[in-house]
Amino acid sequence: MNGYYPVMLKLQGCRCIVVGGGPIAERKVLGLLEAGADQVTVIALDFTPRIEELARGGHIETKARAYASGDAKAARLVFAATDQAELNRQIALDGEQAGIWVNRADEAAAGTFINPSVVRRGELVVAVSASGASPALSSRIREELARQYGQEYIGSTARLKELRERVKLTIGDRRLRSEVLKLAACEAPRQSEEDGDIDVWIERLIAATDRRNT
């Protein structure tokens, strides 16, 4: 029992606050934007050039000032990413008292959630965590997964999503539907968008499933 429950969060419309303006804070901001967060505020006395660039582009909001205890109450997620341990501790305490989820970049176990290492391929998201015990191990496994699940999975996942929606409308038999989707998941990484339209693919999958069952 490691005490962590894995979950995927939908961040659209969710206020996220990052306290800190250095490289660690920048990584947190980029991770949030990659996950679709659209309400990100960064609070610090100064910022990395990349954070400033994102603010100029309207992707995030920056507040060039010191952290105030009331800041955490305005968020759903808070990231304590400063280079001051005592300030990070106070941010985590403020979040805990307000019932807000807080991530401490300097001491993961002292926050209420941690960030896994992530591989993204379109809508495919593969996450791995060592529960804070060894970030280096998580990173190594992430690199292995990145090699195993290459860029081809971006198109594969998109096609599987389209196929699933079509199958739900066209195949009434639940068992057949399940078998078709499982077979499609096996085939998709070896296919490309030029391999034909979705309806033809469905027909071929149904025929292959029928042959398996006879």
Please provide the spans of the model-predicted regions:
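Alpha-helix C-terminal capping/helix-to-coil transition sites in glycosyltransferase folds
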Residues: G13, K73-A74, R121
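E1/E1-like adenylate-forming module used to activate ubiquitin-like modifiers
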Residues: D83, R104-I154
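An accessory alpha-helical subdomain
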Residues: G132-T214
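Glycine-rich, highly charged phosphate/nucleotide-binding loops
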Residues: E53-K73
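Residue-level detector of alpha-helix initiation sites
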Residues: P23-I24, E86, G132
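ADP-ribose/adenylate-binding Rossmann-like module
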Residues: L77-D83, N88-N115
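Hydrophobic, well-ordered beta-alpha structural blocks that scaffold small-molecule cofactor pockets
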Residues: M1-L54
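Short loop/edge segments at beta-strand edges and connector loops
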Residues: A44, T62-A66, D106
